[in-house]
Amino acid sequence: MTDYYEPTLLFRQNALRRYCPSLSPISSVETLSSSILTNENIKGNVSSWMFNSANPKDTEVLNQSCSLNRMNIKSNYWKIPDTNMNLTAMAITDTHTDNPLFSVSSANNESNLFIYELDLLGNYLTHHNTISLPNINGMKWLPNSNRHLVTGNSKGYAHLVSIPEVNRTGNEDSEEQSAEICKRFNHRKHIKSKQDINKHSTISKLDFMNNDNSSLLSIYNNNLFYWDMNDAEAQRRPTPISISSISGLANFDPLPTHNANLVGICGKFGVSLFDLRQPKFTVPPSILEYASKKKLGANQMRWNPNNENVFAAAHRDGVVRLWDIRKQDNFANLSGHTDKISSLEWNDGDLFSGSRDGNIVHWDLTSDLSANNQFMNCGLKEGLDSVHFNPHMNRLERAINERQCGTVLPASNTNIISMCSVTGSDNSKDDMKVLSIDGSSFFGVHSKIFDAVNISMTSDKLYYTESDIQLMMKSENSNNTLVGSTDSINEQVTAPLAITRKSTLKDFAQAADAARPSNLSKDTLLGSVEDLKLAPEPIVVDDDDLKITKEIEDDLEDYNDFTFAPPSFIPIQNGNVSTCSHELDSEEDSGISSVESSPLKREASFKFQLLDSLDFEEKKLPRDDSFNTEMFNDLRMARQASVRTIGTHYRNVYNG
């Protein structure tokens, strides 16, 4: 029995034997001897009545439709301590580092902003802070900063938040720090008609123009706000530079160029370019009607960082379309999802799309699609939709003008909420990883998807060399990978739930074992959610200890619709990590559980208890008549070590 899932092989016997011109129609392959078939070409064309799993022609359709040829797909998962499973957004500071700092937000009222540090090389997650900032629906780190981020909530407020400095030294005597709100941006007060505000409106998107931390864009209630952060620092109540009312606005993405005025926007009207110098924007009714009829409305769009003229947009019909602003038309359709697309990410020319169906699709766009003047339809490499079988020619055929460039990664059993892509410090395309959060409050790190059919994983290495031993010793002594260390800096390091999808073909079983990562031990392969180590719970404090670190500069009218609880600014020292939390009535209310810093060792063992003479008689255990209490006591001391280490029966031990 294999140690991984292998689907049942269901097939139908050939109703008619494949036609071979050199044989009679009623001839049977089994009756033909090798002396009759002297031509090697005739032997190769001869086909058996029975299904032959070793024949590539018989298994070609099965392998592609069931994805049996795929391997080398690896995902690591961590559980985010959000009991309500209400995650909303994820943001990362730097995509070109091996230890990125990222944040995960929730729409809960307390303990809903988590700050983590990810070790891409060692596959470890370190929790630094848990902050209470109610109802976060969108956020963005300031460019080139790991201390400040902007968050948006459901009340129409955006906050510039100062995050405590990450303590990597493990010094417990460091100065106490806490998160604080540096500035508030009130969107709701700048809308003329309060009756037009939808009660479900949230600040769904925040971003900066061209990595410039002085220009902030945000979406609230079908309005695009443009803020100047430099003027906001000097103003008591920040005022936006412009407010553009755009009906059906869903998302935007600034151009990755030095042009600080053009922004790509999308919504019910489709996709469009927007000039910030002309804040008035109207959509013709005919365009809205046509987009609604053809389901061309879009909810996501991302510019290609390698080509300023190309962007990808996710439309309501579940198709990702590639657009070229020079042609004012789309030149490719990427079809691979069965539900609404929730996230798009570019990574070195390739595109990743996440959907509510729980799948992440990697679109291999390495070839220059723009050089091809013909319209291109792109589909999946595997699955039932990727198979086009010609029964007359008995072979697979590609659809006309279709390129199979999508590979599916089943990343979640619920839905994908947000994604980020990282490449590491060496910017290697082979080390490309995708980060995701889903509706089950899981954070996942997915390795790049390879087409492993043509990859040879065989190795003639049968023993460790001296260089291998030295390399393993260095990795064991590293503070970044040593899980069992008692240092305070490693107390919050969490190992992932590692899931490796192996090939289900027997020919690739050995290759899949060789592709398993060597830096994850059996102790890190956790079997359930309860075994995962989560972030430490916030400390319960009294009302007398509350202390606001910085007073918010604003008038009383800003607090009519939104009230902050003072505990959001409480400096709490928890070991070497500063956290902020509300006062809790009990541990169950916190929604965060804490476990030991290192994985539990699950070693099989048996427990035995030494029995005296009376216990033998009461329990009716067999023994010799000459066996007395004194002999038993002497024998007990002699056999004590073996009883504790060897799982044998009492009769074998005491009658020996």
From Swiss-Prot:
Gene3D superfamilies: YVTN repeat-like/Quinoprotein amine dehydrogenase (2.130.10.10). PROSITE patterns: WD_REPEATS_2, WD_REPEATS_REGION. The keyword Cell wall biogenesis/degradation applies. One of its GO terms (biological process) is cell wall organization. WD repeats lie at residues 131-171, 198-237, 291-333, 336-373. It holds the Pfam family ANAPC4_WD40. SMART domains: WD40. Keywords: Cell cycle, Cell division, Cell wall biogenesis/degradation, Repeat, WD repeat. InterPro entries: Apc4-like_WD40_dom, WD40/YVTN_repeat-like_dom_sf, WD40_repeat_dom_sf, WD40_rpt, WD_repeat_multifunction. Belongs to the WD repeat DSE1 family. Involved in cell wall metabolism and required for the separation of the mother and daughter cells. This is Protein DSE1. It comes from Scheffersomyces stipitis (strain ATCC 58785 / CBS 6054 / NBRC 10063 / NRRL Y-11545) (Yeast).
